[in-house]
Design a protein with these regions (language model features):
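Conserved acidic/glycine
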Residues: 1-63, 69, 259, 264-268, ...
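A generic structural signal for short, non-catalytic loop/turn and secondary-structure boundary residues
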Residues: 25-27, 71-73, 113, 244-246
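Cofactor-binding active-site loop characterized by glycine-rich and histidine/acidic residues
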Residues: 37-40, 44-181, 199-205, 210, ...
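Glycine-rich ThDP/TPP pyrophosphate-binding loop and its adjacent helix/strand module
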Residues: 127-316
């Protein structure tokens, strides 16, 4: 049942295969630039001693935006993890609200700035309470999916986690229960190949996280997590399947982590400069920009304008 071939798409096929139009793709790009700009600024503020600990989303943006875009804002539920800055933006949180968490300012809506930045809950946007304890939110997502089923709602629940979390017992118990009861939940693994400093080869003996789905009787899809259209397509397929009552799906999005695990980590101790330079070749920002240019939806002037607007929004935040 596992579909372990890595999925990717081209600009020429995006409209026919996914239903996305140029307007949607450009809106995705704006969100991606805003997220990258904000992430870079937060990282800089941390280095200046002004912002709390940061788990950067750089390299993960396409996986986060593409998956969130495929679901229904305000209706479906999101159990995300500490690196999912872009999802917060897609769902409607403002840069001011998010920045207030990193700067411990009054008015931060997730937790009143009392938790790790980006942690807490925003029920109006379908964001359910985040925990910094790895993988504990995954069984909670399954419980929410069960509740939706019992209440005869067509809610789909998606839970995001990293490759390190995919080896935790909580995740496997959650996948087994969800598959047995055919619950409307999507397990979305953002695989950046490192559990803090532990490489994928030391985490699991199988070739992919997606291949584990077969053991639980659900589809497993491996997708290029730097290709936002491919991610959107895979998540849409999983959401449709869940809504029809066909049960859960495990999606493994292969992404890159451009910075240390967090601002408290030193990744030069376990990653070479050559490896980091190679990962930069799969920049989701550049990939989407190139796709937009191929279909004449992005000019140099418009690109400059989008970057300028993002910097202005972040400056004001």
């Amino acid at each position: 049942m596992a579909d372990n071939g890595s999925r990717s798409t081209s600009a020429q096929t995006h409209q026919a295969d996914t239903g996305l139009d140029d307007k949607n793709l450009l809106a995705m790009y704006r969100q991606m630039i805003l997220c990258r700009t904000m992430d870079e600024r937060i990282w800089m503020l941390n280095r200046q001693g002004k912002a709390a600990i940061v788990a950067s989303a750089q390299g993960h943006e396409a996986a986060q935006i593409g998956s969130a875009w495929a679901l229904r804002k305000g209706e479906d539920q999101f159990y995300i993890y500490y690196r999912d800055l872009a999802i917060l933006l897609v769902l409607g949180m403002t840069p001011v609200e998010i920045m207030s968490g990193f700067l411990a300012k009054e008015g931060e809506p997730l937790s009143g700035a009392r938790q790790f930045p980006t942690h807490g809950a925003y029920p109006e946007y379908g964001i359910i309470n985040l925990s910094n304890v790895v993988a504990t939110h995954v069984p909670q997502a399954v419980g929410a999916a069960l509740a939706a089923r019992m209440q005869s709602k067509d809610t789909v629940v998606i839970t995001h986690f990293g490759d390190g979390a995919s080896s935790m017992g909580d995740v496997h118990e959650a996948m087994n229960f969800a598959a047995v009861h055919k619950l409307p939940v999507i397990f979305f693994c953002e695989n950046n190949k490192y559990a803090i400093s532990v490489p994928l080869s030391k985490q699991m003996a199988v070739e992919s996280v997606a291949s584990r789905a077969q053991g639980y009787g659900m589809p497993g899809i491996e997708v290029d997590g730097c290709d936002i259209v491919a991610v959107y397509e895979a998540t849409t397929e999983a959401a449709n399947r869940a809504r029809k009552g066909d049960g859960p799906t495990l999606i493994e999005a292969r992404v890159e982590r451009y910075l240390p695990h967090t601002s408290d980590d030193d990744d030069t101790l376990y990653r070479s400069r050559e490896e980091l330079e190679e990962s930069r070749k799969r920049d989701p920002v550049k990939i989407l920009a190139d796709q937009l240019r191929q279909i004449d939806a992005l000019s140099d002037d418009l690109d400059d304008e989008i970057h300028k607007e993002a910097r202005q929004v972040v400056d004001e935040a």
